[in-house]
């Protein structure tokens, strides 16, 4: 099933919410994911994202970033499990990162994607590059940093056409978030995929923690979440 409207409609028909937020979404009292972040709700059911941001279920909007095999010794012998790091996004201001474990790769991937949905964030985009000033949300409006373990990542606004000057894992996360042009600096053991991915994700989250002045919104073309209007509605 590749139509976001069909995905959302199917979830609404089959889903039995377990949380207050889930019931509000199911009953149609919350119809925009931006409202969830504005009111400070915590997403504890992946179906909430399936309904409000169904495009994240499209194959091109999901990325498996890392698969690792873990072995643990028990009284009954070795227990082998898979650990999967996955990301989801709508390529327009929303991105999530999650880790899933399972005895089979497929199960671990599904868990990771569901955790990524529940961990989805809304980011600020804009054009903060002094080389550009086009006021379009192709980059980020200001420099931000994120860290995880020994890894530190700094993202800086880039001019249109620059592309994503960052490692492959970072490119995938930024692309899913809808960021097209950035410079980056990294410190620490960046070959550790999980920590590097989390540092990039944390940097994007920190776009929400920088105070902005009203005049900066127009100057840098800042948008929060979606820049493009939704092209579908769920009945």
Swiss-Prot record:
SUPFAM superfamilies: dsRNA-binding domain-like, Ribosomal protein S5 domain 2-like. This is Small ribosomal subunit protein uS5. The keyword Ribosomal protein applies. Residues 60-123 form the S5 DRBM domain. It comes from Thermococcus kodakarensis (strain ATCC BAA-918 / JCM 12380 / KOD1). The lineage of its organism: Archaea, Methanobacteriati, Methanobacteriota, Thermococci, Thermococcales. One of its GO terms (cellular component) is cytosolic small ribosomal subunit. Binds 1 Zn(2+) ion per subunit. Keywords: Metal-binding, Ribonucleoprotein, Ribosomal protein, RNA-binding, rRNA-binding, Zinc. Its cofactor is Zn(2+). GO terms for molecular function: metal ion binding; rRNA binding; structural constituent of ribosome. The N-terminal domain interacts with the head of the 30S subunit; the C-terminal domain interacts with the body and contacts protein S4. The interaction surface between S4 and S5 is involved in control of translational fidelity. Zn(2+) binds at residues 127, 132, 134, 138. The gene is rps5.
């Amino acid at each position: 099933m590749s139509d976001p409207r069909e995905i959302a409609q199917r979830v609404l028909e089959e889903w039995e919410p377990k949380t207050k937020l889930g019931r509000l979404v199911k009953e149609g009292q919350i119809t925009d994911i931006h409202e969830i972040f504005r009111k400070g709700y915590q997403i504890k059911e992946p179906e909430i994202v399936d309904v409000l941001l169904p495009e994240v279920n499209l194959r091109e909007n999901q990325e498996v970033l890392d698969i690792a095999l873990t072995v643990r010794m028990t009284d009954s012998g070795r227990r082998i499990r898979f650990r999967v790091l996955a990301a989801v996004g709508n390529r327009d201001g929303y991105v999530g990162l999650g880790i899933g474990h399972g005895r089979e790769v497929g199960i671990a991937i599904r868990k990771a994607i569901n955790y990524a949905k529940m961990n989805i964030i809304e980011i600020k985009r804009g054009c903060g590059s002094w080389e550009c000033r086009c006021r379009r949300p192709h980059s980020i409006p200001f420099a931000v940093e994120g860290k995880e373990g020994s890894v530190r990542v700094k993202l800086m606004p880039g001019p249109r056409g620059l592309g994503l000057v960052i490692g492959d894992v970072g490119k995938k996360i930024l692309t899913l978030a809808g960021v097209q042009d950035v410079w980056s600096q990294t410190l620490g053991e960046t070959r550790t995929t999980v920590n590097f991915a989390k540092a990039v994700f944390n940097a994007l989250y920190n776009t929400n923690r920088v105070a902005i002045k009203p005049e900066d919104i127009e100057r840098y073309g800042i948008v929060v979440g979606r820049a493009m209007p939704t092209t579908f509605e769920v009945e």
